[in-house]
Amino acid sequence: MMMNFTLSNQVQIPAVGIGTFMMTPDQAEQAVVDALACGYRMIDTAQAYMNERAVGRGVKRSGVAREDIFISTKIWASQYLTEGTVEKSLELLGTDYIDLMFIHQPAGDFMAGYRKLEKAYKEGKIKAIGISNFQGEKLKKLLDECEIKPHVIQMEAHPYYRDEETISALAPCGCRVMAWYPLGHGDH
């Protein structure tokens, strides 16, 4: 059994998961099936990865009950102003809720995208709200203007890099850090 963390809204999130960045749809589907068979219970995807539908197929093929799987995905910046963007991810994933949905980048009208997440959270379509790759003035703007503080930030974090300023700015609202490149990457 994998260890979980508790988010500030009491949602349980697995400590370890598998990401589907740079996977083709076929690779993502099989990776999800294999990861779930090995005991992983968190799967991360994004609209920009263009494999949400494949992740949903992998979840269904796995035979693991949906309520035992934690799915996170991200709204891409070009979709922040698009009506129905959360619902499109729900449809592609083949699920009636998403455990954690992120704003993928602090670009464009990211506050419009964040407001969509707040609305979806209130409607029960998503269980937690996340931000990805935020720091500095854009992070400050988001924290100043949002109604619901983010539950998770996904950011680069590993033994060679730790953004203490961003982590400290989010600590008062109980925001958890989710690392991408948690072990670093090939150029270190």
Give short role names for the model-derived ranges:
Residues 1-69, 83, 183-186:
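N-terminal binding-site loop/beta-alpha segment at the start of enzyme catalytic domains
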Residues 40, 95-98, 126, 150:
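A structural motif
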Residues 82-103, 119-123:
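CE4/NodB-like, metal-dependent polysaccharide N-deacetylase domain
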